[in-house]
Amino acid sequence: MAIKSYKPTSAGRRHQTCSTFEEITSTTPEKSLLVKIKKTGGRNHFGRVTARHQGGGHKQKYRMIDFRRDKRGIPAKVATIEYDPNRSARIALLHYTDGEKRYILAPLDLKVGDTVLSGPEADIKPGNSLPLRSIPLGTIIHNIELKIGKGAQLARSAGTFAQLMSKEGKYSQVKLPSGEVRLVLQDCYATIGQVGNIDHENVCLGKAGRSRWLGKRPKVRGVAMNPVDHPHGGGEGRTSGGRHPVTPWGIPTKGYKTRTNKTSDRFIVKKRTK
């Protein structure tokens, strides 16, 4: 994948960059793996906003992705590499030898015509899914399960990867993209390689409208609001807010720790570094 830029024919074009999509081999998704999505605009069933700055955006259909990789021992051929509007990574359509079709996240260097396999006996090559106990130490992995059979939850966005650090007893130590080192059960499955579309982080949207296409609404500053809307609101003329930064609900922000302790914290060997 590469990034293309544009001639500055307008202010919005000046810094805009876009993917060349050269790795995409099909623009038509597999119909049997599509599901309708109803937009919520960030509202819950009461109609109240529970997730701010969401709404609008281009109409999309959800692609059913196989995060469980539970079709063990049956080889599959990569038919297409496709764009997915619901995630930053590209997806690959697999045709299994028994006739079934599934989507998976497309790892780096996976190409049309390649064969992938899921199971303890699979080779160590991009796209193959194995339990952590069958993966050599130091291997780059992604799409990692936290609970056996639940499906992958870690290292799924474009360009991300984790690394298998060590094995001890029934747990493996995995270094996550954040720098956190975590214990994961050795029977949990992970996929070999790094998630593709690694240049995604270098894309510059260039204009507000492109964010709106993605369903992102403007984030209004608290100091620009009225006192009824935000603790920083009001005042004559421009103000600094007059207090340490807080959320719209009065909770300190910008560095204030709000994360509560969980029982799963005992599986964190080393806290994240970024």
UniProtKB/Swiss-Prot annotation:
Quote the gene name from the UniProt entry: rplB
This chain's source organism reads Trichlorobacter lovleyi (strain ATCC BAA-1151 / DSM 17278 / SZ)
Q: What is this protein called?
A: Large ribosomal subunit protein uL2
Q: Which stretches does the entry tag as region Disordered?
A: 223-256
Q: Does the keyword Isomerase apply?
A: no
Task: Supply one GO CC term from the record.
Answer: large ribosomal subunit
Pfam families in UniProt: Ribosomal_L2, Ribosomal_L2_C
- Which InterPro entries does the record cross-reference, listed alphabetically? NA-bd_OB-fold, Rib_uL2_dom2, Ribosomal_uL2, Ribosomal_uL2_bac/org-type, Ribosomal_uL2_C, Ribosomal_uL2_CS, Ribosomal_uL2_dom3, Ribosomal_uL2_RNA-bd_dom
Swiss-Prot/TrEMBL GO biological process terms: cytoplasmic translation
